[in-house]
């Protein structure tokens, strides 16, 4: 009987482990701007956040070691409002491996400045999927689902929808909280509008472009550089289509911020015709950075 119980316990551990490895996140908490505070408390918070992100079961899928979501979460605290209330920002970076290479492409590089939460030393990080109980864990869970969704979109057309819906559910549960970043009327570039854009059919071409750019473009370049580059150029036309229908979306800005330098590098080696075509598209959808794209023509 004891042997049977041991076997069952081992199987349970293996099952839990196999379902808890979706995310491989680097998590840091910086509190250098907060004076007169026990630094151990923030080290404890950093460890708790690390375990929350990396050990929690986020999906119903088994992820292989090489399939885990590579991301960075940096929480920088800038102000202590009261004994247990803090303000700060979240630096969020999502990376995706490119097929047959050691190269990781950046899919999201964003700073959320609407960060405010309550935390006491030793307090457990509580998160309930169907209710709002803690702003810090809700924000972190929100971005984990955004990470999962963007990653899924890059491997399967519109494959991230279930995860974006999870993130949107967190937004809905947060509508009665006083902390910023969750409501439509606060500004047009916050957590509310990010999931709104991701699930809005009008912006679907952006998500389709993510798939074409990564799965049919970058992932192909090891075997056939020209075909991969051509497919990436085609993916940019989907961005152009979305921008013409509804310009200035938050999602478009975030995506271009993560891809701008990479696009310039990729097409610096393209044909003159492709270079001109890409530069014209990018200047149209990202006019504030038009001079940067002109560098493609000089290469």
Predicted features by range, described:
Residues 84-196:
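Acidic/His-rich structured neighborhood in mature extracellular/periplasmic domains
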Residues 21-87, 98-100:
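Start-of-domain marker
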Residues 50-58, 149-153, 264, 268:
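Sec-exported extracytoplasmic/periplasmic mature domains
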Residues 1-23:
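Bacterial Sec-dependent N-terminal signal peptides
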Residues 32-39, 126-134, 244-245:
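Second-shell loop/turn segments in exported
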Residues 28, 211-299:
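A cross-kingdom marker for long, charged
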Residues 159-252:
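Flexible, glycine-rich surface segments
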């Amino acid at each position: 009987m004891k042997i049977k119980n041991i076997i069952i316990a081992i199987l349970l551990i293996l099952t839990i482990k196999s379902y808890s490895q979706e995310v491989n996140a680097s998590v840091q908490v910086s509190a250098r701007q907060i004076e007169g505070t026990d630094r151990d408390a923030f080290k404890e918070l950093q460890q708790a956040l690390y375990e929350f992100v990396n050990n929690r079961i986020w999906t119903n899928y088994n992820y292989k070691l090489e399939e885990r979501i590579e991301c960075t979460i940096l929480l920088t605290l800038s102000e202590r409002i009261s004994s247990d209330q803090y303000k700060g920002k979240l630096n969020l970076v999502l990376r995706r491996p490119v097929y047959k290479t050691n190269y990781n492409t950046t899919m999201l590089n964003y700073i959320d400045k609407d960060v405010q939460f309550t935390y006491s030393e030793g307090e457990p990080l509580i998160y309930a999927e169907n209710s709002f109980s803690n702003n810090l864990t809700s924000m972190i869970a929100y971005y984990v689902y955004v990470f999962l969704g963007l990653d899924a979109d890059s491997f399967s057309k519109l494959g991230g929808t279930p995860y974006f819906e999870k993130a949107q559910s967190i937004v809905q549960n947060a509508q009665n909280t006083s902390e910023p970043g969750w409501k439509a009327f606060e500004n047009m570039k916050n957590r509310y509008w990010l999931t709104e854009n991701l699930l809005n059919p009008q912006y679907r071409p952006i998500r389709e472009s993510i798939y074409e750019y990564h799965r049919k473009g970058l992932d192909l370049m090891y075997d056939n550089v020209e075909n991969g580059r051509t497919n990436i150029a085609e993916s940019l036309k989907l961005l152009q289509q979305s921008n013409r229908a509804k310009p200035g979306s938050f999602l478009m800005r975030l995506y271009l911020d993560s891809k701008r330098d990479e696009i310039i590098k990729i097409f610096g080696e393209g044909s003159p015709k492709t270079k001109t075509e890409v530069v014209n598209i990018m200047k149209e959808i990202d006019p504030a950075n038009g001079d940067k794209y002109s560098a493609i023509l000089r290469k």
